């Protein structure tokens, strides 16, 4: 469809016989465009499509000298200025005295005394002629409801603002503000204070610039506005464009795979104008709900109750997203303003569901930026945590929007802020370069988590890998040890955020080519083991798997919602037997990465697509699973996957995978068997292994960690696997052999009410039934005893020496008597 709005830099020709004064020539209609074809009745508007430029030259000569017609010719951009559309207007429309630009003079305190937004509903700067552009040709693609005014107006959401409830539905805490003039500390202090949950503020120094917003839907007239900032989220297949002005937001979502969507937000007294199929006397705004206390929302998309009804329902839903009152006390951008809705939908299984899914996510991102911009403008400042929160979640959800929602795994995803949007963000990037990373690594869990958030948000993927890999690994290890030694682990938002960010950054580092790629692969395999160990049956029973339940709980609470509240170690694990089928796993599956390697999608059962590290991650971090094409192990739904060594993995399944060294666990319900396969990279043969019964050596009397790297597996005769725990250091090993005296409840058999058995899986492929640990009696002498003994021996020797010396030095007095006769 050619562009028909005259403000789009199109070449146009307006000729009238009155202006040219050329004589009327009686010649045949060589171009086939007779006078009656263009407009036989004086004073009427008509048009003709697909007109050749030669026809225009003919008409130029044919029009009468003092006629009352004016015609306009618009080239089709694809025709190289040879063909286009011609319109014939009555001349009277261009001599009306109505001014072209009329602003609404209504007073509005947040916007000044003159509206910052007003429509340019005119033709050649004359609004009188706008009524002529109401033909079917201009809206043949049916962008809006056309036959029923009931479809034109949307019901307002009960959670948005009204005159009686100007703050709408409250789910966020009060916004903090600077006590004095908003200031920003130095670079280093900026990050340290943020990580320590102390506020810094930026002043709102954005500049306004006059601009014109050109809607993607050409039926809507352009809007004059005061431009502030904007954002693009784009790939080779998709573009999300957000334009922010004073009291104005323009949002558009365009893709080669899905129908377009556009949202326009204006001050509540601004009447946008559009071309419709109704008669010119019925002037309508674009579709949308009624205005709120400050803003009016318009939604444009392809759908109504009769045509594309599912998308029309989506349009009505997202019309309630832009808040109709700037929440100076309750900013909706905290915690991502869009994550609550994001978690309320399972991953769609069809095209209509996917369209609604990505439309809602992208709209939430746009309205979050608009809300922050308005609150920032009205208050004169922005808190650093508000800006970081928005940027972090925008980057996070952009991956879902473009990569997962659009099935666009191969194209890079880009986020571009323009004009005033980079104010403050440059300062944050500079601050990251001055921080002492070693100092942060020794901080508290919340300090390290917020630092990882900054790294993810404001650095490149290459730099992310270098700065975050070791820190991420340490965080995962600390959380794993805490879960081992604590009977009740408090998985609060901080712990979930730290685990999520650590998992995500390790994942990114392993999926890009960098100097630490191999180190990242090793860290990722260890991450799998530790998260699988943390995903016990007891923990899984406490996870809120249902997104709808999470949203329901949110509506009943006044606390701030965070996307991390729905995260769990199970979502970053390779444990598949205790997960729930709800869609929350699908929601988290698309988060971590910004660009993917160009690889073929591994052939894994569709039931495993919804775990955060499956499909893309299993192929990257555990390639030995897919090193034998065509083997059935590539197509099974496993119980668990344990990357236990270098290029070696234990695969636990219910069916024989026909690959690797196979161990069949005895004493298990025949309907629910446990088969353990030890897989090596490139080895596709089959061997039968034997699980060895017996006692193991007690490692208490040695400093060497005999069982580090092994996996402790507790199971029941029913086939249920209770625990899969990694032995990762000497302290955990000693707890393992302590038995009933172990402070780790998973190692203590008295903690289990029903009988269970234990296997120990070694990194070399050996599996042993754990019966007991054999203790050998060893006489141990303390160092004090040894030194005392040495001293005693020395003293005894000294005494003996003295005695001998005395005996040897003694001379007897022997006297002889001469015997005489």
From Swiss-Prot:
Alphabetically ordered keywords of this record: Fusion of virus membrane with host cell membrane, Fusion of virus membrane with host membrane, Glycoprotein, Host cell membrane, Host endosome, Host membrane, Membrane, Sialic acid, Signal, Transmembrane, Transmembrane helix, Viral envelope protein, Viral penetration into host cytoplasm, Virion, Virus entry into host cell
Residues exposed to the Intravirion side: 805-821
Signal peptide: 1-20
Keyword Iron: no
Glycan attachment points: 66, 236, 241, 308, 414, 492, 647, 741, 764
Keyword DNA-binding: no
Segments in the Virion surface topological domain: 21-783
PTM characteristics: N-glycosylated, O-glycosylated, and sialylated.
InterPro entries referenced in this protein's UniProt entry, alphabetically: Herpes_gH, Herpes_glycoH_C, Herpes_glycoH_C_sf
Renumbered residue ranges of the record's region Interaction with gL: 236-299
Cellular localisation: Virion membrane; Host cell membrane; Host endosome membrane
One GO cellular component term: viral envelope
Membrane topology designation: Single-pass type I membrane protein
Quaternary data: Interacts with glycoprotein L (gL); this interaction is necessary for the correct processing and cell surface expression of gH. The heterodimer gH/gL seems to interact with gB trimers during fusion.
Purpose: The heterodimer glycoprotein H-glycoprotein L is required for the fusion of viral and plasma membranes leading to virus entry into the host cell. Following initial binding to host receptor, membrane fusion is mediated by the fusion machinery composed of gB and the heterodimer gH/gL. May also be involved in the fusion between the virion envelope and the outer nuclear membrane during virion morphogenesis.
Protein name (database record): Envelope glycoprotein H
Organism per entry: Feline herpesvirus 1
Gene name for this UniProt entry: gH
């Amino acid at each position: 469809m050619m562009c028909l709005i005259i403000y789009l830099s199109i070449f146009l020709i307006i000729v009238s016989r009155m202006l040219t004064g050329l004589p009327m020539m009686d010649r045949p209609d060589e171009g086939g465009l007779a006078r009656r074809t263009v407009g036989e009745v004086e004073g009427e508007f008509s048009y003709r499509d697909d007109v050749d430029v030669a026809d225009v030259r003919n008409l130029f000569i044919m029009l009468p000298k003092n006629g009352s017609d004016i015609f306009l010719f618009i080239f089709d951009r694809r025709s190289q200025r040879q063909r286009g559309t011609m319109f014939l207007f009555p001349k009277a429309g261009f001599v009306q005295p109505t001014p072209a630009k009329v602003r609404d003079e209504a007073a509005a305190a947040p916007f000044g005394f003159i509206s910052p937004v007003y429509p340019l509903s005119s033709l050649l700067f004359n609004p009188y002629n706008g009524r002529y552009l109401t033909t079917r040709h201009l809206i043949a693609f049916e962008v809006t409801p056309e036959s029923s005014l009931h479809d034109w107006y949307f019901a307002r959401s009960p959670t948005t603002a009204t005159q009686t409830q100007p703050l709408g539905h409250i789910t966020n805490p009060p916004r903090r503000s600077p006590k004095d003039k908003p200031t920003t500390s130095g670079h280093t202090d900026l990050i340290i204070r943020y990580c320590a949950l102390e506020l810094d503020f930026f002043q709102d120094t954005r500049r306004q610039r006059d601009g014109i917003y050109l809607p993607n839907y050409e039926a809507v007239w352009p809007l004059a506005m005061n431009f502030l900032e904007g954002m693009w989220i784009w790939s080779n297949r998709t573009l999300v464009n957000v334009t922010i002005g004073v009291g104005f937001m323009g949002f558009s979502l365009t893709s080669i795979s899905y129908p377009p969507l556009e949202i326009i937000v204006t001050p509540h007294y601004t009447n946008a104008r559009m071309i419709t199929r109704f008669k010119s006397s019925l002037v309508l705004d674009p579709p949308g709900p009624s205005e709120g206390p400050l803003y009016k929302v318009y939604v444009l998309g392809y759908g109504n109750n009769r045509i594309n009804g599912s998308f029309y329902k989506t349009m009505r839903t997202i019309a309630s997203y832009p808040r109709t009152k700037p929440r100076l006390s309750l900013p909706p951008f905290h915690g991502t303003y869009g994550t609550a809705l994001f978690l309320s939908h399972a991953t769609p299984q069809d095209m209509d569901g996917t369209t609604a899914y990505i439309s809602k996510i992208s709209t939430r991102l746009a309205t979050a930026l608009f809300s922050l911009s308005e609150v920032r403008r009205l208050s004169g400042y922005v808190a650093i945590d508000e800006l970081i929160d928005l940027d972090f979640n925008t980057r996070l959800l952009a991956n879902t929007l473009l990569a997962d929602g659009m099935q666009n795994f191969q194209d890079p995803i880009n986020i571009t802020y323009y004009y005033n949007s980079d104010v403050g963000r440059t300062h944050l990037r500079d601050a990251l370069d001055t921080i002492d990373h070693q100092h942060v690594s020794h901080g508290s869990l919340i300090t390290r988590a917020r630092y990882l958030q900054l790294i993810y948000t404001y650095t490149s993927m290459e730099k992310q890998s270098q700065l975050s890999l070791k820190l991420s690994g340490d965080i995962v290890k600390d959380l794993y040890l805490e879960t081992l030694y604590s009977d009740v682990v408090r998985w609060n938002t901080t712990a979930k955020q730290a685990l999520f960010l650590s998992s995500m950054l390790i994942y990114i580092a392993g999926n890009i080519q960098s100097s630490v790629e191999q180190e990242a692969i090793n860290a990722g395999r260890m991450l799998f083991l530790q998260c699988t160990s943390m995903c016990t049956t007891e923990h899984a029973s406490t996870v809120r798997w249902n997104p709808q339940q999470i949203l329901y709980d949110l509506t009943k609470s006044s606390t701030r919602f965070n996307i991390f509240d729905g995260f769990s170690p199970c979502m970053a694990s390779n444990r598949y037997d205790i997960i729930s089928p709800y869609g929350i796993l699908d929601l988290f599956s698309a988060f971590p990465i910004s660009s993917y390697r160009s690889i073929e999608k591994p052939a894994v059962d569709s039931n495993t697509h919804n775990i955060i590290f499956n499909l893309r991650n299993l192929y990257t971090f555990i390639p030995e699973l897919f090193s034998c094409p065509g083997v059935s192990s590539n197509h099974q739904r496993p119980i668990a996957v344990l990357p236990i060594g270098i290029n070696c993995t234990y695969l636990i399944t219910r069916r024989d995978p026909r690959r690797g060294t196979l161990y069949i666990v005895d004493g298990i319900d025949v309907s629910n068997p446990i088969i353990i396969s030890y897989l090596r990279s490139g080895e596709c043969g089959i061997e039968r292994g034997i699980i060895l019964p017996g006692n193991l050596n007690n490692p208490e009397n040695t400093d060497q960690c005999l069982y580090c790297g092994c996996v402790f597996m507790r199971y029941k005769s029913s086939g249920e696997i209770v625990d899969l725990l990694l032995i990762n250091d000497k302290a955990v090993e000693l707890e393992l052999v302590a038995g009933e005296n172990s402070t780790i409840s998973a190692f203590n058999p008295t903690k289990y009410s029903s009988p269970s058995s234990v296997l120990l899986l070694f990194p070399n492929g050996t599996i042993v039934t754990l019966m007991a640990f054999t203790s050998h009696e060893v006489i141990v002498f303390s160092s004090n005893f040894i030194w005392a003994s040495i001293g005693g021996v020395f003293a005894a020797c000294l005494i003996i020496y003295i005695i001998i010396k005395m005996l040897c030095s003694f001379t007897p007095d022997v006297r002889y008597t001469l015997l005489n006769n």
